Amino acid sequence: MLKSLNDEVLQSHVERFNEGVRSGDFSRMLEQFTEDAELAFEGVPVGPFRGRPAIAQAYADQPPDDEIVILRTRESGENLVVADYAWRAEPASRAGSMILRLRDAEIDRLLVTFG
């Protein structure tokens, strides 16, 4: 089965995120966001961050310390990807969901939920 463009963007985002966790450099991941993108979190008291510079600053100020793995894609629409994720340290335990809204194969909005 061929992967959809949305699934490819999700897979690329996870690979680039994990690369950033390992190296401390999230610049390749940030390239996937539109200039006016929004990063929001549900279940933790941070954000939202609007615009690529604000998102970059958020990752610089509070870099994640664990990689993520995708457990399953629950739903995928024309411009939307919803995926359950886990932290690599606990790959069998669902940590939350990532909801990516796309515009021209770039991330326009990313909502990360915990729990």
Which functions belong to the PLM regions below?
Residues 14, 39-41:
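Short, flexible active-site loops
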Residues 44-47:
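Short glycine-enriched, charge-decorated loop/helix-capping segments at active-site entrances
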Residues 1-4, 40, 56-115:
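A beta-strand edge to alpha-helix "cap/lid" segment located at domain peripheries
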Residues 14-17, 21, 33, 55, ...:
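Hydrophobic alpha-helical core bundles mediating ligand binding, dimerization, or RNAP-core interactions
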Residues 1-31:
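Short, low-complexity N-terminal intrinsically disordered segments enriched in polar/charged residues
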Residues 26-30, 35, 52, 56:
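An amphipathic alpha-helix signature
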